């Protein structure tokens, strides 16, 4: 998700009524509707109810949170399943311990009234991206699913300016846009977009946003309590989407705008109802996808990549 309308640092602290265990959670970006269960758990007192004082920190650099967890500088970080596979192969001691958003959000984004009606129309066109590696593999899979390859298009690094690059005509499409944000952002700005969903264009389904911990140092009991609180928060969100939006928006003035209201409505159905539960096949399939794409040298066992912390 690439937005610039909010501040890049945001911290919420619960006030302990009794002696509580302190936990540090690094977000993947500034606070936004993707983080709904976390903010609701904080605002509704669900963390305090399980004796946790959770410090929620947004990073100055979105690439830092997994590294900080690996280095023992944070207990948990929000990250992305595709990146986790690569980071483990790079030697970072990380493991998925929970899921926040249980579906892909990534999409191939084009102008709704533009010339790209199917991904096959990208032949000879420019496609913007912000992060190499996984996004290139995702794009390659989409192109091959539609009879093309990366050789048929021109890749343009637009950094984090995905929708601006598309709306300005710098590129004909962008990969890495989040369907719950960029589509709404473009519509609000009067330039409607259209998403080709990666899971419908040749990609295996995956968990977009996950929680990662250091398997060598993590406190399983504390993390289990954290997920008990966020699961309760997710149930509240699903049962009371409007009331929960009001609680979420009231937590910070920056959240009280049309973009976040729209994104909230689009994100609610995608939150993991059982954050600790995991699909072993999903992680095995994506590991195989990355290996086939040549991004990893060998296949790790799923037990290395992910775990259910509630299982003894």
PLM-predicted stretches and their roles:
Residues 1-9:
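Sec-dependent signal peptide recognition
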Residues 14-16:
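N-terminal signal peptide c-region/cleavage motif recognized by signal peptidases
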Residues 21-158, 163-164, 168, 172-180, ...:
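Short, glycine-/small- and polar/acidic-enriched structural segments
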Residues 46-49, 145-150, 189-191, 221, ...:
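Short helix-capping segments at alpha-helix termini
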Residues 82, 161-251:
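Pocket-lining segment of extracytoplasmic ligand-binding domains
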Residues 100-110, 191-215, 227, 265-267, ...:
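Periplasmic-binding protein-like
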Residues 219-295:
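Secondary-structure end/capping motifs
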Residues 284-312:
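Conserved C-terminal helix/tail region of periplasmic/extracytoplasmic solute-binding proteins
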């Amino acid at each position: 998700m690439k937005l610039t309308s909010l501040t890049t640092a945001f911290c919420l602290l619960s006030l302990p009524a009794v002696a509580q265990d302190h936990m540090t959670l690094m977000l993947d970006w500034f606070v936004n509707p993707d983080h709904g269960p976390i903010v609701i758990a904080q605002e509704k007192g669900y963390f305090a109810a399980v004796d946790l004082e959770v410090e929620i920190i947004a990073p100055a650099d979105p690439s830092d949170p997994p590294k900080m967890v690996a280095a023992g500088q944070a207990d948990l970080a929000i990250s992305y399943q595709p990146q986790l596979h690569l980071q483990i192969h790079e030697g970072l001691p990380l493991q998925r311990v929970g899921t926040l958003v249980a579906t892909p959000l990534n999409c191939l984004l084009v102008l709704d009234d533009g010339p790209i009606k199917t991904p096959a129309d990208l032949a000879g066109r420019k496609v913007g991206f912000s992060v190499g590696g996984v996004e290139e593999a995702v794009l390659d899979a989409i192109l091959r699913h539609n009879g093309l390859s990366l050789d048929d298009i021109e890749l343009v690094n637009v950094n984090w300016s995905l929708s601006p690059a598309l709306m300005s005509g710098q590129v004909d499409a962008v990969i890495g846009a989040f369907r719950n944000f960029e589509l709404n952002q473009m519509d609000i700005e009067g330039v409607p977009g259209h998403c080709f969903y990666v899971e419908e264009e040749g990609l295996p389904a995956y968990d977009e946003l996950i929680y990662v911990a250091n398997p060598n140092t993590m406190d399983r009991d504390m993390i289990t309590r954290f997920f008990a609180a966020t699961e309760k928060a997710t149930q509240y969100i699903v049962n009371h989407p409007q009331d929960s939006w009001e609680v979420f928006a009231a937590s910070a003035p920056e959240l009280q705008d049309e973009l976040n209201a729209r994104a909230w409505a689009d994100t609610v159905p995608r939150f993991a109802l059982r954050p600790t539960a995991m699909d072993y096949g999903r992680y095995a399939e994506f590991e195989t996808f990355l290996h086939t794409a040549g991004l990893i040298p060998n296949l790790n066992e799923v037990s290395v990549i992910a775990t259910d912390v509630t299982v003894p």
